[in-house]
Every structure is written in structure tokens, then in C-alpha cells.
Amino acid sequence: MLLKADFHIHTREDPHDFIRYTAVELLEEAARQGFDVVALTCHNKRIHSEELSRKAEELGILLIPGVEAAIQGKHTLLLDMPYARLKVRTFDHVRALKRDGGLVIAPHPFFPAPKCLNGKLRENLDLFDAIEFSHFYTQTLDFNRKAVEYARKMELPLVGTSDCHRLWQLGTTYTIVDAAAKTIPAVFAAIRAGRVRVVTAPLRPFDRLRHGLKERRNRLRVRSEGLLGSALRFPSGAFPSIAQARIHSARGAERRLTRSEDAFR
């Protein structure tokens, strides 16, 4: 079965970012957009609960417990792993934790920010089941390109995510998973087997402006409250221009993606 999924989403319960909508409001919007699978991945906090799971089930959504953890200072998505019960701080901790299952995704791995994986992805490649294709790119500025090339080279699947911090971001980029069933094990098995495709389109200039304003508000809040900021800062400069994203499956087959695949919305 084909499942519309997003594996990287933040909500108001996130301790590191100023977000207006709650987890319940996010689930309601995801249901409105026709999502089948959602992972809530707040920074260093696993917010999954029986109440949220029941709400998701009522809405027809498979809810995957998750967290965007700072592992040796690098953002790493841990899905369906008991992060809250253990002090997971190093990649060796993640290796030990993964023996009991779960899925590990490299989020925005080559973006120009200290908290992005970059070289740590290469050093710990055995840990990662998939690489993220982030919603944050335009036709002239695209930090996903290196991730696409690296995923193809390493024969790892790409999963599209919104990294949602504002509701308008949900649905900008997502994944279609061809799973045997609508269960966490079946979804994870499909990802590992490369039975996924990314649905995406570059942000419009106005969307990028909104994104920048959001990051500025986050930084102001961080300074006023003395918190450790998690905003990504993107330097100005010339980057190769692309007119359309080219996404590669785990087997290296090139796939052009357009909004025509939005039939799943």
C-alpha cells in the first residue's frame, strides 16, 4: 500500500524552538492533508504519549514516536527508540540502542550549520537507514544536492520531510512509502528496502522570506530566555542552480519529481 508520510516534525512541546501549534493541532492538519504516517521529532524530547497515539488513530494516522537528538552535538533523527529512558549522547549509545530496533535518519546532513552531521555521517554510516531530503531549498539555493549525490553513492534511500516548524511547511516535501501494511515495522522495512519516493517542489521566494523571519524570531527568543539556539544560519553566496530536484532511489535510478505527484494529498 502507498502511504503518505513525514518523518521530521516539530510542535509546541519542543523545548528548543518557538512553535505556535500543538501536537494535536499538527495531527489534525496532517489528517486534513491526507497523511497516513507521521513522526513527531522534537529536539531532545520524546513527546509520544498514549493520548497522542489514540488521537492519531482516530484521525487515521500511524504515529511513530521520535526525537531529533543532539548526538555528539549533531542532529540525528531517532524513530521508535526508547530515547527518554536512556542518556543517548554518543553514536556508540545509538548503536547499542538500535540493537532493539528503530530507525535512524540523517536530517539535513550537509547543510552549512555546526549541528548538521556532515563528516559524522560518513564516520558513522553503519548507523543510518536513510538520508533526509529537506523542504528548505529554492531553485537557486539547494543544500540537498550533496545529500542526493551521497545517498546514490552509498545506496541509501532518501526520505522527504518538512522539518515542520510552521503549519504551512507541512506538505511542502514528504515521502510516499510503499509498505506491506500500515504498521511501524512494515514502514521501516519499506524504507530500508528503498520502496520510497520523495514528493517535493522548491520554495517560492515568499516562503523563504517567511522561513527567515521565523528563524529570526527563534533567535530573539533564544537570547531572551538564555536557551541554546537550534536555528540554522545560511550564508549568502553562489550555489549551483537547479530548475528541478532530481531524486535517486536506493538502487540509483534517477527520478524527476514534480507536484503532479500531489495526487496523494
Language-model segments: what does each one mean?
Residues 1-7, 11, 15-28, 46-61, ...:
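Charged catalytic cores and adjacent phosphate/nucleic-acid-binding surfaces used
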Residues 6, 27-44, 102-105:
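Divalent metal-dependent hydrolysis catalytic cores, especially in the metallo-beta-lactamase
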Residues 14, 100-103:
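N-terminal processing/targeting junctions
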Residues 35, 95-98:
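Secondary-structure boundary/capping motif
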Residues 41, 108, 162:
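Short beta-strand/turn micro-motifs composed of small residues
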Residues 105-113:
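Aromatic-lined carbohydrate-recognition surfaces of secreted/lumenal glycan-active proteins
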